[in-house]
Regions:
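Alpha-helical scaffolding segments of alpha/beta enzyme cores, especially the outer helices
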Residues: 115-118, 122-129, 161-168
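Conserved SGNH/GDSL esterase-like catalytic core that processes O-acyl groups on lipids
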Residues: 22-27, 32-121, 157
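Bacterial Sec-dependent N-terminal signal peptides
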Residues: 1-21
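Helix C-cap/helix->beta junction micro-motif
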Residues: 54, 130-132, 172-173
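Surface-exposed, proline-enriched loop/turn segments that connect beta strands in immunoglobulin-like
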Residues: 225-227
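Catalytic His-Asp segment of secreted/periplasmic serine-dependent ester chemistry enzymes
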Residues: 21, 38, 141-218
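Short, solvent-exposed loop/linker segments at the N-terminal edge
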Residues: 229-235
Length: 235
């Protein structure tokens, strides 16, 4: 009986320690992160596919909110959504942010573009307060295909301006910059509605994040995470 009790306690302690050692990855974003238009976001979204790639030593949280803007005066500010509160409470060791697509809306960018950098820095600071040791990765925007109804009326140009702002933010905030644009750009068919990736497209995003986190670029170079003295675990 004592042996059984000891074994049960030992297994419980091992389970707790194992859970404590999992690297938490918070995926922050809009409908592209959430998995909108996908058959089953719970398994098909890029954060879900990322979980499969990283394995059990990581815990990936999907905190995507459909329609969310980065701009705090936008039509649906991310920092005012429940998903933001949950992401902060999650206190990820790694925070992956992909926001800005919805800010190309004519209600938003033309009126509040001057606040974009300030608002993005505030978002980054919020996650650093929640976990001062977190590593933050921000993504260049996914493409918007030229068949989008507002593509030529402003979306194309505003999308480009936001890309430039994101690159500036990465340098100023000292965070890792990751590219969600180039991997999808040659394949517009992966964006059936001109904005949201299909399952294959979401898989490409998952692999892009996986490479940014683990440094597995097919032997080309290591992720910036290694410069932060962070020990990463492979599943």
């Amino acid at each position: 009986m004592k042996k059984i009790l000891f074994l049960s306690l030992f297994l419980m302690v091992c389970t707790i320690l194992s859970a404590q050692k999992r690297v938490k990855v918070a995926c922050v974003g809009n409908s592209i992160t959430y998995g909108y238009t996908l058959p089953n976001p719970a398994t098909d979204s890029y954060p879900s596919q990322l979980q499969q790639l990283l394995g059990e030593t990581y815990e990936v949280g999907n905190f995507g909110k459909s329609g969310a803007t980065l701009l705090n005066k936008g039509h649906r500010p991310y920092m005012q959504q429940e998903e933001f509160k949950k992401a902060i409470a999650f206190a990820g060791d790694i925070v992956v942010i992909h926001l800005g697509i919805n800010d190309t809306d004519p209600r938003d960018w033309p009126n509040y573009r001057d606040s974009f950098v300030k608002d993005y820095l505030a978002l980054i600071d919020s996650f650093r307060v929640a976990n001062p040791k977190c590593h933050i990765i921000i993504a260049r925007l996914t493409p918007i295909a030229d068949r989008h109804p507002r593509f030529e009326s402003g979306t194309r140009d505003w999308h480009g301006e936001i890309q430039q702002s994101i690159e500036t933010i990465a340098k100023y905030a000292g965070v890792q910059l990751m590219d969600f644009h180039e991997p999808l750009y040659p394949y517009p068919y992966l964006l059936p509605d001109a904005v949201h990736p299909n399952v294959e497209g979401a898989g490409i995003l998952a692999k892009t994040v996986y490479s940014a986190i683990t440094g597995d670029f097919g032997g080309l170079h290591l992720s910036e995470l290694y410069t932060d003295n962070m020990v990463l675990q492979h599943g």
